Regions:
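Conserved lysine of the Walker
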Residues: 58
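Conserved nucleotide-sensing/catalytic segment adjacent to the nucleotide-binding pocket
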Residues: 92-133
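ATP-dependent NMP and nucleoside kinases share a basic, alpha-helical "lid"
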Residues: 156-201
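Charged, amphipathic alpha-helical linker segments immediately N-terminal to NTP-binding catalytic cores
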Residues: 1-28
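Conserved small/polar residues in nucleotide/adenosyl-binding loops
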Residues: 227-228
Length: 229
């Protein structure tokens, strides 16, 4: 499946807001079948694990599913695995900047803490949700308290969300989703394939939200592909 860059630019030149809206509507429609399946397995599977490679729009997909379910009066909470990263020391920050720490490894996650919170969510216990500050490379507990009540759904999204070495909650409580980029972009007799589209997305995200230069993201991407391709 592919689309030409010229066609994309023509649609943007005609009406950029309409183009964005039509893309969103098309993706919403593709998610509707997934949402129907999620609803069919409730309340037995209150935890949705959503995974995919870096730059595959995991966060966007989770938020869209949350929005659809909320509009159906099914309270849904989207949480990112990124917020369960272990804080870095100053020494580790320097090592990471020099490419000597694998930032995509599941070992970056506080696995016991994560699973403890997930079990509490399943049981309806209150948890104080963490937040990872990528500019400071530190995790903090926020004032956001989550107490899942019966029929509430929790979406956990992240690269390692489907990794059994990371999340070990009972399988019968879990609904699994995997997302990835499938479309290529063609321009000047070249083809921008899904992995490179994901790289472009990641460069934009890292620059805006993670205090990371385009060059640094590019240097990291080969390492990232070991886990996400």
């Amino acid at each position: 499946m592919s689309i030409s860059l010229q066609n994309i630019n023509n649609l943007i030149d005609q009406d950029v807001q309409r183009f964005i809206l039509e893309c969103d509507v098309q993706y919403y429609k593709s998610l509707q079948t997934v949402v129907d399946t999620i609803i069919s397995v409730q309340p037995q599977k209150p935890i949705i694990l959503l995974s995919g490679p870096s730059g595959a729009s995991k966060t966007t997909t989770a938020l869209m599913i949350e929005g659809i379910l909320d509009n159906l009066s099914i309270t849904t909470h989207s949480l990112s695995l990124d917020n369960y990263f272990i804080s870095f020391t100053k020494e580790q920050v320097e090592l990471a900047l020099n490419g000597k720490i694998d930032l995509e490894s599941p070992c970056r996650l506080d696995i016991p803490f994560l699973n403890d919170q997930l079990i509490k969510m399943i049981n309806g216990e209150s948890v104080a949700l963490p937040k990872y500050d990528f500019k400071k490379d530190q995790r903090i507990l926020t004032n956001r308290i989550l107490t899942r009540i019966p029929n509430d759904i929790v979406i956990i999204e992240g690269t390692h969300a489907l990794n059994p070495d990371v999340i070990s909650i009972p399988r019968e409580k879990v609904f699994k989703i995997y997302v990835d980029v499938q479309q290529s972009v063609i321009f000047d007799n070249c083809t921008l394939r899904p992995p490179m589209i994901r790289l472009v997305r990641r460069m934009i995200r890292d620059k805006r939200y993670r205090n990371r230069s385009v060059q640094k993201t590019f240097e990291m991407f080969t390492n990232c592909l070991l886990y996400t391709s």
